[in-house]
């Protein structure tokens, strides 16, 4: 329960509010410095005007305060909503990176003129510098080649499905990092918050889709995808592991690419994230691209091979010696034909990765 003067939630679809937005600027990687910017949408639902000051505290991974930024004094009329801002320099910064999921805690506070707390919100986030261009992607001033996994967004485990605790999400996503992957391309729909936060912790870059229909679409179906992307960006824009916004599983038109970029520019203009899709080599406005089954290169677009080892096996089958003792290839028909590619075991998948 909050005061009638409060910081909003990042729930745009239901509440039409955008919440907190925290981002870095003026990165000095070698000098370990970054300017931390905190923006908060504040609403006054009181029957009278309310005044407050806006503050931000930065805590490191050990809970030690490493930054305290004092903002301006604001006055909001009854029913008014306003975005307030504060920024300051963070020294001796730890930059989030592949395999190094360093996270800070940012506390944004509203205080009355007498110094009493009106409202505070705690946000976990990290800071990293990104650059896209000349066919390359740079993370913290170093070029990095993308390689990893295209994982079903369900990210399920045998026996429990999607209902997994956070530690199991960390274990699962850390396996991707420890096997040499620096990227997870979630398939078709936006992942749940637990997996997003898990990737923050283990240092795994994410490509985040909103919604997808296996191809570009028109009319109301495209409008729904835009709405999903807007909602997903607002809800997840403080998670440093998200670096790519995917407009669709396959390429989209130039007009649609521009619409997706407009959403990113409005709601995440400073997050250092690229908006693109697969098969976008011919769309100059796309900020990254890739191919399904082969390697391609571009003078402009950072690209990666997005499904070079396609495997549709169900994760619920380990091997023939483990419960449920599934025989390799057994299972229902798909469109009247055997579906071996779906009904095989994970030991077969592991062997194919080595091959």
Go through each PLM region and give its residues.
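Secreted/periplasmic carbohydrate-active enzymes, especially glycoside hydrolases
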Residues: 1-190, 198, 228-229, 243-244
């Amino acid at each position: 329960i909050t005061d009638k003067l409060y910081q909003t939630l990042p729930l745009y679809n239901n509440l039409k509010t955008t919440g907190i937005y925290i981002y870095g600027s003026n990165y000095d990687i070698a000098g370990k410095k970054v300017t931390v910017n905190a923006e908060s949408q504040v609403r006054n639902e009181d029957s009278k005007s309310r005044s407050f000051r806006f503050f931000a505290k930065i805590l490191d991974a050990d809970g030690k305060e490493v930054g305290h930024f004092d903002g301006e004094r604001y006055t909001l009329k009854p029913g008014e909503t306003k975005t307030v801002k504060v920024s300051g320099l963070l020294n001796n910064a730890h930059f989030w990176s592949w395999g190094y999921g360093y996270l800070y805690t940012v506390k944004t506070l509203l205080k009355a003129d007498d110094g009493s707390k009106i409202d505070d919100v705690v946000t976990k986030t990290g800071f990293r510098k990104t650059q896209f261009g000349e066919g390359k992607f740079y993370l913290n001033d170093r070029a990095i080649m993308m390689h990893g996994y295209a994982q079903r967004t369900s990210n399920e485990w045998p026996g429990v499905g999607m209902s997994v605790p956070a530690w199991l999400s960390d274990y699962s996503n850390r396996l991707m990092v420890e096997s040499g992957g620096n990227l997870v391309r979630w398939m078709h729909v936006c992942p749940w918050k637990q997996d997003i936060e898990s990737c923050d912790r283990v240092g795994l870059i994410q490509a985040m889709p909103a919604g997808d229909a296996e191809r570009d679409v028109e009319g109301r179906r495209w409008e729904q995808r835009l709405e999903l992307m807007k909602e997903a960006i607002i809800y997840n824009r403080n998670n440093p592991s998200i670096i790519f916004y995917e407009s669709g599983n396959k390429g989209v038109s130039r007009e649609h690419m521009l619409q997706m970029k407009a959403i990113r520019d409005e709601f995440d203009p400073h997050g250092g994230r690229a908006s693109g899709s697969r098969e976008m080599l011919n769309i100059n406005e796309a900020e990254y691209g890739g191919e399904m089954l082969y390697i391609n290169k571009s003078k402009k677009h950072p690209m990666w091979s997005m499904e070079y080892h396609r495997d549709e096996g169900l994760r619920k089958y380990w091997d023939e010696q483990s419960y449920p003792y599934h025989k390799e290839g057994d299972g229902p028909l798909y469109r009247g034909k055997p579906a071996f590619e779906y009904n095989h075991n994970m030991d077969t998948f592991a062997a194919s990765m080595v091959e």
